[in-house]
Each structure stands twice: as structure tokens, then as C-alpha cells.
């Protein structure tokens, strides 16, 4: 009981559960992205501002080089996603593939399959986006 009282006293908000399947997700079109791109907002951490989304991009879509001030994690659900971080080699993820993209590292992602790419993204803090020229 002391633990519960401590949580209330410190004002820590308890997280809400999120349980969904791809087939049940409510997809919305992303403004500013190519036709056919969609996302599903899953949750945001009230304390860190971190977010989790499902994202779909059409075949051939390239996400231009950019970086974030926070770490990013990607898990590919369908398609083939090319990932390049910093000056490292390009790696193609297949379904089930995982990428950890460190904060402030330039990243470039592209859907290199003949079908759309669907993936989960988690940012561990408030999202910002810095384009690289």
C-alpha cells in the first residue's frame, strides 16, 4: 500500500494498455508524405513525450536523410526496408527485422520492396526532425 500511496503522492501517471493487430488498426493518411502513406498513433508517454506508431509507406518511398534528438527503434512487419545510419553500410531489413537508430545520428530509410513497407516506430523522447541537406 505504501507503494501505491507513493505513486499518487509523486503524481506519476500510470500508463494505459494498448493491444491491437495490424488488421484492426485505424490507419490515417499522413499529410505531407507521399500518396499511400499511412500511420496509426499507438501511444505517447506523458512523462518523456516518447511516441509509438505503426507506419506504412508505398513501395519505392525514400525518407530523406534526417536525424532526431532522441533514440528511435524500428521493427519491420512487412516489405523490405533499407536502413543506413551515419556513415555505416546500408542494411536491408526483412519482416521481423530490427533497427536501433541512436539520437543525433543521420538516418536514411527507404522501402525497397515491390510492396508497401509496414513498420513499428518507437521514439524514446519528444520527437523532433532535422533534415540534412
What are these regions (language model features)?
Residues 47, 87-104:
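Short acidic-glycine-tyrosine-enriched beta hairpin
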Residues 58-61, 68-86:
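Glycine- and acidic-residue-biased ligand/ion/polar-headgroup-sensing regions
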Residues 51-68, 102-104:
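Conserved short histidine dyad/triad with adjacent acidic residue
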Residues 14-51, 132-133:
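A short, N-terminal "cap"/entry segment at the start of jelly-roll beta-barrel domains
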Amino acid at each position: 500500500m505504501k507503494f501505491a500511496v507513493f505513486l499518487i503522492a509523486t503524481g506519476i501517471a500510470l500508463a494505459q494498455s494498448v493491444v491491437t493487430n495490424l488488421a484492426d488498426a485505424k490507419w490515417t493518411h499522413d499529410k505531407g508524405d507521399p500518396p499511400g502513406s499511412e500511420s496509426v498513433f499507438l501511444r505517447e508517454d506523458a512523462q518523456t513525450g516518447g511516441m509509438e506508431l505503426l507506419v506504412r509507406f508505398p513501395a519505392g518511398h525514400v525518407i530523406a536523410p534526417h536525424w532526431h534528438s532522441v533514440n528511435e527503434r524500428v521493427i519491420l512487419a512487412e516489405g523490405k526496408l533499407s536502413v543506413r545510419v551515419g556513415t555505416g553500410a546500408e542494411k536491408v531489413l526483412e519482416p521481423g527485422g530490427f533497427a536501433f537508430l541512436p539520437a543525433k545520428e543521420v538516418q536514411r530509410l527507404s522501402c525497397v520492396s515491390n510492396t508497401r513497407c509496414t513498420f513499428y516506430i518507437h521514439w524514446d523522447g519528444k520527437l523532433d526532425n532535422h533534415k540534412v541537406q
